[in-house]
Amino acid sequence: MMREAAELTGVVLYAQPVGEYDRRLVILTRERGKITAFARGARRPKSPFIAVTNPFVFARFSLYEGRDSYTLAHAEAADYMTELASKMPGVLYGYYFLELASYFGREGLEAAESVNLLYAALRALIRGQMSPELVRRVYELRSLMINGEYALPESGAGMDGCAWYAVRHTVASPVSKLFSFTLSEEAERSYTAEVSSAFRRTVDKTFKSLAVIDKMR
């Protein structure tokens, strides 16, 4: 009896070559969190998996489940994020977002809001209406909140008024409306300080892509 494929929607976080023609993928999915999948023959010149097995691709994946990983049977891309490649330094921030999504991602736990947040953050980098650094801080703070690592303070004491409003907006707004504000230089400094402080208290990992961004400043 033929196994039924699992239908999962998500974003490709990592893709690395395996053997002569295959690719190993890490995908953050709405339904089952972070998974590992193998795309057989994905590196062959005429493979239907060539384009859909790259980082940033948002797609619907049909996968056969094994003991420790999945095997890709079919994929239908909704967004290849091709515009991001020409955005500098936006693409570097994009890779950082993928790293952070992988850090927080857990296998077997639904991650619909995390997938939606990642997709919205990547699209915000492409639109370019917010600075990549502000997009980063919004993404970081909302990620902390989703994962139960940030509680909104009772007041914004010591914080710029606009920054305090931005913090509340980041925590409470629908993902579709998150990346829709700008701040003055002073307010952004205050907002960044709050997010950075909360982030350092929780996350103890060094992110390679973030180190590259810091070197470019």
List each model region and its residues.
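Non-catalytic alpha-helical scaffolds and adjoining flexible linkers that form interface surfaces
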Residues: 1-23, 28-217
